[in-house]
């Protein structure tokens, strides 16, 4: 059996009930985002990052296509700008960008961290049992 050394779960835990992001942001992502709703920003700066493809991300993509300087997009991609959206105004289309993985489309509800971990463990145990019974 091949195994992973680790997994990146930031997108999943972003949509946990314990995450301090505004509930409206988490609910929007859970109900509206699909795996096709991502784009890669900052490629022209050798810092490729997958983001939720909304209005601000599209502005950044357009500016990058015009060979902009980082200063031209800094305000859009700054963590402080995203914090305003996450914790103050919830304006997904007009404030900052959201770093997510393509798995965003597989998440359709906000649940507790405990439920996320239990679900992963259950899936792991089922996989191990499946391997054991196939030998």
Region spans (language model):
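Conserved active-site-proximal phosphate/metal-binding subdomains
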Residues: 1-135
């Amino acid at each position: 059996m091949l195994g992973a050394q680790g997994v990146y779960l930031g997108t999943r835990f972003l949509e946990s009930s314990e995450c301090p992001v505004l509930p409206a942001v988490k609910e929007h992502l859970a109900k509206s985002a699909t795996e096709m709703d991502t784009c890669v920003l900052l490629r022209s700066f050798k810092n490729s990052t997958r983001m939720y493809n909304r209005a601000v991300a599209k502005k950044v993509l357009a500016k990058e296509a015009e060979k902009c300087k980082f200063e031209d997009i800094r305000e859009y991609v700054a963590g402080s700008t995203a914090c305003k959206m996450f914790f103050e105004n919830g304006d997904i289309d007009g404030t900052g960008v959201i770093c997510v993985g393509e798995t965003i489309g597989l998440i359709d509800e906000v649940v507790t961290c405990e439920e996320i971990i239990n679900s992963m463990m259950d899936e792991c145990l089922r996989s191990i049992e499946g391997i054991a019974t196939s030998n």
